[in-house]
Amino acid sequence: MVYKTKNPDQVSWTQKIPQPSLDFIHSFNLPKTAKIIDIGSGDNMLVDYLLEEGFENITVLDISIKALDKVKKRLGEKAQKVNWVVSDITEFQPDSTFDVWHDRATFHFLVTSEQISVYLDRASKYVSDYLIIGTFSEKGPERCSGLPIRKYDEDQMSLSFSDGFKKISCITLDHETPFKTKQNFIYCSFRRI
């Protein structure tokens, strides 16, 4: 719904350069053939940077076809190099696993124990190597785009993903929205065990 009526500079999660995500991905020293999925990508710029860096096996998932259409239009012919999936993450059942599962700002929209359980099950089944989760920290907002969210600290993140994953590192940082407000995020990376 949001992507039908708003441009990137009108939504709080817009991030021109997804630096924390790129830093985590670079730290894994991945081959360019690594299978990377961006969960709840919306119209963010991560796929642009991954393509520019030569990654060849990228999947972009979002519940909004409008958001994905905006990204496809922005990428032009490069969009043909990406696997596009329109799905709610709690209904997503891929055919194979991913070397990297990246999620910036989707996990915190899952507020019921059932939604969270399904998400954790999907991650457990379909992540072969690395997991990156960026979500609102305990200092983050109470709502986002009018929707309720769930906030996390490092211990809660580690516990949430403790079944099958070992935490590599976590960072907290302020994301500056297009309207110059600050939102505090926690990013954690995990390795499959």
Predicted regions mapped to residue ranges:
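Short catalytic micro-motifs in class I SAM-dependent methyltransferases
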Residues: 105-109
